[in-house]
């Protein structure tokens, strides 16, 4: 722990807590602050001026990043066309049998993609899936008539995003060995998407602040790009 503490102290000194870093400089610096022995995740937190008690100010959707974020996910496809879903890259495929397996405690997956047909049966598992963030939703295109295209998109790196109860959006943008320009491009794609989703009822400042961090590392603040 002493070595970790010393390393943390050293990298923290690299960051000016009072500075808003231009986005390119921010990513170049944050990659230098990783303190883990493994390749760390580079994450972004966007704090928004939202009242999440109002449904219209709860942001949720999916983003297809321009560059890979270096994370693979286990997809469960609940569909009638199991063969095509499997060929598209789904890790697990099935129909009502998989829903029954979930009901009995099987949760060895990260994402469910399904068609509207199965939502009646899945909806009965709302308490089990909803609390874990696993319930499919049309907003994230995990409930769709084109299950195959959705599987391919998520396997290529498409990610769900949603505001937490404080109005923050947290996502991984890549890893410390990802090219800086790719991290910047992914960040800009997310920021532009968030800007486009500004609720009409929000007054004044919308994006309050942006911060970057690595796994277990310190954070730094980013100047909002024009």
From Swiss-Prot:
PROSITE patterns: RIBOSOMAL_L1 (PS01199). GO terms for cellular component: large ribosomal subunit. The keyword ATP-binding does not apply. One of its GO terms (molecular function) is structural constituent of ribosome. Disulfide bonds: none annotated. The keyword DNA damage does not apply. Keywords: Repressor, Ribonucleoprotein, Ribosomal protein, RNA-binding, rRNA-binding, Translation regulation, tRNA-binding. One of its GO terms (biological process) is regulation of translation. HAMAP family: Ribosomal_uL1_B (MF_01318_B). Binds directly to 23S rRNA. The L1 stalk is quite mobile in the ribosome, and is involved in E site tRNA release. Part of the 50S ribosomal subunit. PANTHER family: 54S RIBOSOMAL PROTEIN L1, MITOCHONDRIAL, LARGE RIBOSOMAL SUBUNIT PROTEIN UL1M. Belongs to the universal ribosomal protein uL1 family. This is Large ribosomal subunit protein uL1. It comes from Mycoplasma genitalium (strain ATCC 33530 / DSM 19775 / NCTC 10195 / G37) (Mycoplasmoides genitalium).
């Amino acid at each position: 722990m002493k070595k970790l503490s010393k390393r943390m102290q050293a990298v923290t000194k690299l960051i000016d807590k009072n500075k808003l870093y231009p986005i390119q400089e921010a990513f170049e610096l944050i990659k230098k602050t990783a303190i883990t022995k493994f390749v760390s995740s580079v994450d972004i937190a966007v704090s928004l001026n939202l009242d999440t008690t109002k449904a219209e100010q709860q942001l949720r959707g999916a983003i297809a990043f321009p560059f890979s974020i270096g994370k693979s996910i286990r997809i469960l496809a609940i569909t009638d066309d199991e063969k095509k879903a499997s060929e598209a890259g789904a890790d697990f495929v099935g129909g009502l049998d998989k829903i029954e397996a979930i009901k009995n405690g099987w949760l060895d997956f990260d994402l469910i993609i399904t068609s509207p047909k199965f939502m009646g049966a899945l909806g009965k598992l709302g308490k089990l899936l909803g609390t874990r963030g696993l319930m499919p939703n049309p907003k994230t295109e995990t409930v769709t008539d084109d299950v195959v295209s959705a599987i391919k998109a998520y396997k290529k790196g498409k990610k769900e995003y949603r505001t937490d109860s404080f109005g923050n959006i947290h996502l991984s943008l890549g890893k410390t060995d990802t090219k800086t320009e790719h991290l910047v491009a992914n960040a800009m794609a997310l920021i532009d998407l968030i800007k486009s989703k500004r609720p009409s009822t929000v007054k004044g400042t919308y994006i309050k602040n942006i911060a970057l961090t690595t796994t277990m590392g310190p954070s730094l603040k980013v100047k909002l790009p024009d």
